[in-house]
């Protein structure tokens, strides 16, 4: 399969890149713009409660460097700890972005772990779906929860690989694999990626994409890391499509003895 044919579709929108990136933690908007350009990402997530996209006319506007005409914006509810706040934030985003209805839902449980509050996440997801939103949802790596979120109408499930910003990489490969196997909507690892091998690993498990922010913005050289992540996601996807060899306990000679000359 050619790269141009291996597209990623969510909520009826089709993309070439399977790397989704955030906009926080960069030194300035110029670095934000350059890193996102180099990443090749087409979907860019924005924390509505923390990022100015027009709410504050006297402050720098992210949309001046991340144009909605070039990128698909994915407003998110980072910093929300209740379903009510998350729903309100999504409605604000829709108002600011002229009816844009693709959102990333996250309802956090506490400040220490930033793990999702699952009951509140389900409550918010149900309300947002009923209100006409296309909901991509941050969740735990529990396969049952992921399936339940799909059943309430979320257009993508986004299990954490590890706590947000931890850089620990995927901690529970088997759960992520089970979520992928059970899902009929896209699955994207969201949170915990620390370096390129983590992103590649997520794709090798069969995930449809990877979303990251800190792994790029927090690197010593963010623009170079953005390039590395782009290649890692592409390599991991190709490896998944190619089909890895099975793991074996013992050796298997790469040069068979049959037909040897002596």
From Swiss-Prot:
Signal peptide range: none
Sites where the protein binds 1-deoxy-D-xylulose 5-phosphate: 165, 191-192, 213-214
EC number(s) per entry: 2.8.1.10
Positions of transmembrane segments: none
Reaction catalysed by this enzyme: [ThiS sulfur-carrier protein]-C-terminal-Gly-aminoethanethioate + 2-iminoacetate + 1-deoxy-D-xylulose 5-phosphate = [ThiS sulfur-carrier protein]-C-terminal Gly-Gly + 2-[(2R,5Z)-2-carboxy-4-methylthiazol-5(2H)-ylidene]ethyl phosphate + 2 H2O + H(+)
Record flagged with keyword Metal-binding: no
Keyword ATP-binding: no
Compartment(s): Cytoplasm
Catalytic residues (positions): 104
Keyword vocabulary terms for this entry: Cytoplasm, Schiff base, Thiamine biosynthesis, Transferase
Chief localization: cytoplasm
Pathway: Cofactor biosynthesis; thiamine diphosphate biosynthesis
Protein's job: Catalyzes the rearrangement of 1-deoxy-D-xylulose 5-phosphate (DXP) to produce the thiazole phosphate moiety of thiamine. Sulfur is provided by the thiocarboxylate moiety of the carrier protein ThiS. In vitro, sulfur can be provided by H(2)S.
Protein name, as recorded: Thiazole synthase
Name of the gene: thiG
């Amino acid at each position: 399969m050619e790269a141009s044919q291996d597209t990623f579709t969510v909520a009826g929108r089709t993309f070439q890149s399977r790397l989704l990136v955030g906009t926080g933690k960069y030194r300035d908007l110029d670095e934000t713009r350059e890193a996102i350009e180099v990443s090749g990402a087409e979907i860019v997530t924005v924390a509505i409660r923390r990022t100015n996209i027009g709410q504050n006319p006297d402050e720098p506007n992210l949309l001046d460097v991340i144009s909605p005409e070039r990128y698909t914006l994915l407003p998110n509810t980072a910093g929300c700890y209740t379903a009510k706040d998350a729903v309100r934030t999504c409605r604000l985003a829709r108002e600011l972005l002229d009816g844009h209805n693709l959102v990333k839902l996250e309802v956090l449980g506490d400040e220490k772990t930033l793990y999702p509050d699952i009951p509140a996440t389900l409550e918010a997801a149900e309300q947002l779906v009923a209100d006409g939103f296309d909901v991509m949802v941050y969740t735990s790596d529990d396969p049952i929860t992921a399936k339940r979120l799909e059943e309430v109408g979320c257009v993508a499930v986004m299990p954490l690989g590890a706590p947000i910003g931890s850089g620990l990489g995927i901690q529970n490969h088997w759960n992520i694999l089970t979520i992928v196997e059970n899902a009929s909507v896209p699955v994207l690892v969201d949170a915990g990626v620390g370096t390129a091998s983590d992103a590649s690993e997520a794709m090798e498990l069969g995930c449809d994409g990877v979303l990251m922010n800190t792994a790029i913005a927090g690197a010593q050289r963010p623009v170079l890391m953005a390039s590395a992540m782009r290649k890692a996601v592409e390599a991991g996807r190709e490896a998944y499509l190619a089909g890895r060899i099975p793991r074996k306990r013992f050796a298997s000679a790469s040069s068979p003895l049959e037909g040897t000359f002596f």
